[in-house]
Structures are given as C-alpha cells and as structure tokens.
From Swiss-Prot:
Keyword Cytoplasm belongs to the record: no
GO biological process, one term: dolichol-linked oligosaccharide biosynthetic process
Topology Cytoplasmic: residue spans: 1-24, 154-163, 232-247, 339-342, 404-408, 458-464
Gene for this chain: alg6
Protein's name in the database: Probable dolichyl pyrophosphate Man9GlcNAc2 alpha-1,3-glucosyltransferase
UniProt keyword annotation of Endoplasmic reticulum present: yes
Location within or outside the cell: Endoplasmic reticulum membrane
Pfam families (UniProt xref): Alg6_Alg8 (PF03155)
E.C. number(s) listed in UniProt: 2.4.1.267
Family according to the record: Belongs to the ALG6/ALG8 glucosyltransferase family.
C-alpha cells in the first residue's frame, strides 16, 4: 500500500483529504452525497423498455407490480395478468412493490398506478418517483452492511485512507449501478439482505444471519446462488469445534419461522392452491436453460453444439444440476470443514460463480450475484487480489454491454467504467507472468470487441455475431475468475489445515 497518498490513485487522494482527526467525520456524508449524485446522473438516462411498446421492459414490470399489488387481493397476486408482466418474484418483492405503490398512489399521483389504464404509463414525474425508490433502497439496505464489512476488516487495513478507498470502489462498482439505476431493477435490496447476513456471520450472530438470508431468498429467488455456501458454513459452525445440536435446531426453526411469516397470507387462505402457484411463477423451468444471450457455459456451448436440439428440457435440467453441484462442491466442503470468517467471501464467490456458469435459467443480470462477494474482497487488504477483482468487475459490466446498449445507456456505460477504473487505478496486472498474460489478453479482447460492436455492423447473415463474441469472451473470463476464487480458497484452507495440525502436534 502507498504511504504517500498524494502520489496514489485519485480515490486515495480524495480520501486522504479527510484523514485528519477534525475532518474524518465529514468523510461518510461526502461519500454518500457522491454516491447519490452518481446514481442520479445515471438515472437521468433511459431505462429498460423506454418508449418501446407494446410490452416496454423491466421499468414497466416493476411499475405494474405496484399497480397489481395495490388493486388485487393478495390471493390473486400470482394469478392475475400473467401475460402482462405477471408477478414472478417471491412475496417480499410483492410486499415492497405494494409499499411503494401505496406511497405513489396516495401521496403523489394515482394515475401512475391506476388499475389497467396505467399500463405503459410514462412521465418524467413517474420516472423521478421510481428512480427515487431504487436510490432510497440502495442507501438504506445495501450501503450500511457494506460499510460494516469494510469497518470489520479494518483490523487488516488499519490505515484510514486505504480502507475507505477500497470501500469506495465497492460502492461504485459499475455493473450494479448501471443495472439498478440505469436499466432499472432492485437488485440492491436482495444483495443488501445477503450482505446483512454476511455481516451477522462476522459477528457470530447466526440466527440473525439466517433470518436476513431467508429474507433475501423471499425477495429474489436468485439468492439461491448463495444458499449452499451459507448452509454449509452454518452447518460447520454447528459441528466444529464441537457438536451444537441446539444451534442447529434454532437455525432450523428460524428458517421455518421466516418463510412462514412471509408466506402467511397464502398459507392462511388456501395453501394447497396458492403455494404451488407461487412456486410455479418463481421457478419457471419451462422458459428453458437460459434467456437471451448470457455468458454462461450452456449459452456459449450452444454456439458450436445445439444442446437444446439434442436434449429434452428435463434432461437439460438434470445435466445442469449435475454440473452445478460439481462446480460448487469444493467451496461448500471447505466452508463446512473450515467455517472461518476469512473464507466467507471467497466461499460465497466461488459457489455463486459456479451457479452462474452452470445452473438452469440464468439471466445476464445474474452476474451481479457472484460479483458482490468478489468485489468485497477488496476490503481484505490483499493487494495481490486487486488485478483479479478489477478484471471480474470489468468483465461483468462488459458482459452487460449488449443489454445496456439496447437500453440506450452507452454514455453512462463508458463514463462510469472509465471513471471507476481511473479513480481506483484498477487496470493493474499480477506479477506472475502467466497471470499477467491472461489478464492482459482479456482486456485487449474486451477493447477489440467493443470497438467492433461500436463501429462495424454485423454481417446480415449473422446479426448476433458481436453479441456471441461478447458472450464467449465473458464466459472464458468468468470461468477464469471462478478458477481463481476456487484456487485461492483451496490455498487459504490448506494453510488453515496445516496450522491446525501443527497446533495439535504442539
């Protein structure tokens, strides 16, 4: 780490202005204001489905769920308007949509969420309201646990400047900001609940961690990416260093209680009819192995081997399940054998990358899940990991380029990506010659493909050629990041094993 911050990265120079005792209290207000300012700059641009009837896009889906939950009995939430952005997220998302719908309807403009007639409604005022709900959710739910995580690891990075420079880079990661505040979604809520779970694991508050993770699952089903690692970590704490059966029972009761609480209206009314419909909507296996062009194994393989023409849907489900289990097994076993806090982020990252690369029904935006635990590794203070974390972030936002380009967010994309890499001096390379070559190759590949996409139209015979190139390079990069997280996890766990063995011998 640099000791003379004035010669360091711009983010270090910024933080160093607050390192005096009299100025430290100003740092976090300035950080929050800077984050909100950036979110609003992104929000000025268009969103998913802007002015594109008849179905519009994710913005209309989120608005419609507010309309639907506002005017429809709870028992019909998962039955109504299935052809017009029917509700396909778990109940906590529905509750949040209802809450925001109540605020918009009664305190601002009822036309925004009028039953049926508001479909496709677009106005500057509605856009301002919807954008505000995402920003508020981001600040209230995601930012606090990230700050706690950074502070908890401050014992590894006692220096005020280095510690908070890392926090800034995590808070300003381009992929999440562009998807939530540009494209328009509420991923920050689910990711924030996951971070609250991780924060409570750091505090040994296992019941609270279980509760928050169950909330994440009931907000977005994609939080399942983290279910195996957190399960095996918690299971490990129940049997090591000694068996704690009472803890296992308490955690099990917490899971049952949380899901029962969230699902209570449907359980109370008619669980035999309503719960199966919720499961059917939340897990739409009939949609296929993936949607659109996504940088995972199956979509990449499909460019040379048409797997959907060879295997049935059921066979693909089984095959993807086997591949996913194989990819997440090592990290889950390590977290079970060594439930240590220093392994949490790496274990979550490795398992969620495995899920993203090999699981069934993956969206391109799902890359935000493995990107979160990968990014928070910056807070651990190991400078040798920075090149890989930076590469993961740049690959993630690069893989989202076709979607963001479609949304008309090209200006926001390039501005934010260039700014993030510049302020954090993120385009750095490992000292290892092989690693340096791999990292440099991916950066060159991204620049070349972006240049081609911007200035050369694809052949009429292959209109998706540039997208396929993007998917192929991104998959190769993500698989490399997966191998890196797994390799690092194995390395640290082997050192832990050696240390434990030496203690026993002593």
């Amino acid at each position: 780490m640099l000791s003379e911050f004035e010669n360091g990265a711009p983010v270090q120079q910024f933080v160093s202005r607050f390192r005096s005792y009299s100025s430290k209290f100003l740092f976090f207000p300035c950080l929050i204001m800077s984050l909100v300012f950036m979110q609003w700059l992104i929000s000025i641009g268009p969103y998913s489905g802007y002015n594109t009837p008849p179905m519009y896009g994710d913005f209309e889906a989120q608005r419609h769920w507010m309309e639907l939950t506002l005017h429809t009995p709870v028992s019909q939430w998962y039955f109504r308007d299935l052809q017009w952005w029917g509700l396909d997220y778990p109940p906590l998302t529905a509750y949040v949509s209802w809450f925001f719908g109540i605020i918009g309807h009664y305190f601002f403009n009822p036309e925004w969420f009028a039953d049926v007639t508001s479909r496709g409604f677009e106005s500057l005022e509605l856009k301002l309201f919807m954008r505000s709900t995402v920003i508020a959710s981001h600040l209230l739910i995601l930012v606090p646990p990230l700050m706690f995580y950074s502070k908890w690891w401050s014992r590894r990075i006692p220096n005020f400047v280095d510690r908070n420079a890392s926090l800034i880079m995590v808070l300003f990661q381009p992929a999440l900001l562009l998807i939530d505040h540009g494209h328009f979604q509420y991923n920050c809520v689910m990711l924030g609940l996951v971070m609250y779970a991780i924060a409570n694991l750091l505090k040994n508050q296992y019941v609270a961690a279980t509760f928050f993770f169950c909330l994440a699952l009931t907000f977005k089903q994609m939080a399942l990416y983290f279910a195996p690692p957190i399960f095996f970590y918690l299971l490990g704490t129940c049997v090591k260093p000694k068996i704690r059966f009472s803890r296992f029972i308490l955690l099990s009761v917490t899971v049952v209680f949380t899901f029962s609480l969230i699902l209570f209206p449907w359980i109370y009314m008619d669980y035999k009819t309503l719960l199966p419909q919720i499961l059917h909507r939340v897990f739409p296996f009939a949609r296929g192995l993936w949607e659109d062009k996504v940088a995972n194994f199956w979509c990449t393989l499909n460019t040379v081997f048409k797997i959907r023409e060879v295997f049935t849907l059921h066979q693909l489900q089984v095959i993807s399940l086997i591949f996913t289990l194989i990819s997440i097994l090592p990290s889950c076993v390590i977290l079970f054998l060594y439930p240590r806090k220093r392994l949490l982020a790496l274990g979550f990252a490795s398992a969620s990358w495995g899920f993203f690369l090999f699981s069934f029904q993956v969206h391109e935006k799902s890359v935000l899940l493995p990107l979160l635990p990968t990014s928070i590794l910056l807070c651990h203070g190991n400078i040798t990991t920075k090149p890989w974390i930076a590469l993961a972030n740049n690959l993630a936002v690069f893989s989202l380029w076709p979607l963001l380009k479609k949304d008309g967010l090209g200006l926001q994309y390039f501005t934010l990506v260039l700014m993030w890499n510049w302020i954090g001096d993120m385009v750095v390379f490992s000292k290892n010659v092989l690693f340096r070559f791999i990292q440099l190759s991916f950066y060159v590949g991204m620049i070349v493909i972006l240049g081609i996409d911007l200035f050369i139209p694809p052949p009429s015979r292959y209109p998706d050629l540039w997208v396929i190139l993007n998917v192929t390079l991104s998959f190769a990069g993500f698989f490399t990041i997966y191998l890196w997280t797994l390799g690092r996890l194995l390395h640290i766990s082997s050192k832990l094993s050696t240390d434990l063995r030496n203690k026993k011998e002593a």
